[in-house]
Amino acid sequence: MITSNTQTDSHPYPKIRPEHLGPNSPAGKVARMTVGDNNADEFAGLDVNDPIFDADSPTLSDQFPAPYGQAHNPSSDRAGTSPGSFANKPNIGGPRMFSSPDTPGMPAPSAKTAWDFLPDGWTTEETDSHATGCLGHNIGLTAEEYLAGKLATTYIRAVPNDPNFKPVTQLESARLGIVTPEMRRVAEREPHLTPEQVRDEIAAGRLIIPANRKHLAKNLDPMCIGRASKTKINANMGASPVSSGTEEEVEKLRWAEQWGGDTVMDLSTGGDLDATRAAILEHSTVPIGTVPIYSMIIGRKLEDLNEEIIMDTLRHQAEQGVDYFTIHAGVRKGHLKFVKNRLIGIVSRGGSLLAKWMLVHNRENIMYDMWEDICDLMREYDVSFSIGDGLRPGGLADATDEAQLLELATIGELTERAWRRGVQVMVEGPGHVPLDQIEYNMKLQRTLCHGAPFYILGPLVTDVFPGYDHIT
């Protein structure tokens, strides 16, 4: 039997060095890694001799080993429980809220929250009432106390460095201790939460309200996504160059809302994308998300994509009222080397488009380089991020490999940077993942992304049922 700390040749988890995680953030060095100029490799600009590709170095899976063999049944040491009732106490405000006990050896939650990533120059102050300040759940506690589930009792609020600062986003309002009308509406729809708890979870970065100010002015009914809330279901739809149109997409929206879809993504790649998107937003009562790069390349070559096109497209869609953008900024030039070892390669359309752009231009991901500018634009409208996982596995054989987890570490850094700009964040996740790797993936994201909501595209535990992803 393999014990929980044994490494074997068949170890399914990736070899990523622990220094990829810091010093200043869990994502740190991997998100800022550089590569050489050896053009001999088919991935132009990658130096195959760079130490970052040394498979014998200590790895991320050494720091966060997955348990094997002696995985333990939580019911054996939790008095009064029976199989199927292993839940931890549902305390609002801790990193393990509404969870089951961790399998021994899993990555621990992050001791940091969005409170640790305030804008430069901001401070915090104590308040005397929950009506005017948040429970800063990891404020005033040691990391050990916080991770053990102890809750703070001090009410705090953020103090901007500009005395005339006016909050624009739900995150900024929450940091200032403000309960917005949208938070009150969310609490009505989540009866186990109070408006103050909704605010506190948003301030911690564990909850988002995807609600573009332009869409709120129409008929959007605010909802929330995050661990403290009920599980939400997204419905994908979209017109293609050969099928569907505006009327059909609006009809799909009606069906999605009727049968309980909490959010809808318009993934149209053909037809009149602009008119279709406008019609959907005009009729939708649920948040609408898009993948803006799909529109950016309509009518032009991918290699012509530049900063002006990106910003113009994002602003136009934000003006229309799109509530969240999926942006694949976590796919970095240095990650492409690891895709060569995959059985299937890159299956994300947005990820593959940006990978090709990087290879053509022999430079870093343009979305990564523009991150702060993109954040500032999204803040104006309170558009939320759904940070895309462009290197998600397209089959079980590629699950939890170097490429996937290097990108996840980068996404952790992008989450921190977005929080510093006052923008709400959720994180996209895989994808095709074997059943025994799901918990490891979930817990590692919780660590690297500090509890930001995880918007998983599945996970799909089999590759042999194409066309039925809603079942698998």
Mark where each language-model region is.
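Alpha/beta enzyme core
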Residues: 2-146, 161, 169, 173, ...
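A ubiquitous short alpha-helical element
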Residues: 153-154, 168
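Histidine/acidic-rich helix-loop-helix segments that form or flank divalent-metal centers
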Residues: 467
